Swiss-Prot record:
One GO MF term: structural constituent of ribosome
SUPFAM superfamilies: Prokaryotic ribosomal protein L17
This protein's UniProt keywords: Ribonucleoprotein, Ribosomal protein
Top-level taxonomic group: Bacteria
Protein name, per record: Large ribosomal subunit protein bL17
Organism: Roseobacter denitrificans (strain ATCC 33942 / OCh 114)
Lineage per the UniProt record: Bacteria, Pseudomonadati, Pseudomonadota, Alphaproteobacteria, Rhodobacterales
């Protein structure tokens, strides 16, 4: 019987899974779309949904709860300043998981997980800013 088997272990320890979800949630918040394996994407969805719900609350306790799950303060800031207000009228269903074929090396099923009303310019924004800063430094 599979009683009390509510999540995928993904062949990792509890601490490794906790770090994995913190890193993946931060990447998804920063880029608003990431590509990963299908089981990881399916497990990440409820974690992100709960964080968006915390961001919609917007109080100090919710911010501290989100900060305890995420690794960097910039992710918490974007979560509460950008994503929370964006989804204030939506009652759940903030992210979607799209199947994306199979990985070449090991045929693992891949998926794209993204926010529903995502900002298409967010993906790669840090790289564009870094390249622009390097070009300005070379010109000066």
């Amino acid at each position: 019987m599979r009683h009390a088997r509510g999540y995928r272990r993904l062949n990792r320890t509890h601490e490794h899974r906790k770090a994995l979800w913190a890193n993946m949630a931060g990447s998804l918040i920063e880029h608003e779309q990431i590509k990963t394996t299908l089981p990881k994407a399916k497990e990440l969805r409820p974690i992100i949904e709960k964080m968006i719900t915390l961001a919609k609350r917007g109080d100090l306790h919710a911010r501290r709860q989100a900060a305890s799950k995420l690794k960097e303060d910039q992710y918490v800031a974007k979560l509460f300043d950008v994503l929370g207000p964006r989804y204030k009228d939506r009652q759940g269903g903030y992210v979607r998981v799209l199947k994306a074929g199979f990985r070449y090396g090991d045929m693992a099923p891949m998926a794209i997980i993204e926010f529903v009303d995502r900002d298409r310019d967010a993906k790669g924004a840090a790289d564009r800013a870094r390249l622009a800063a390097e070009e300005n430094a070379e010109e000066a």
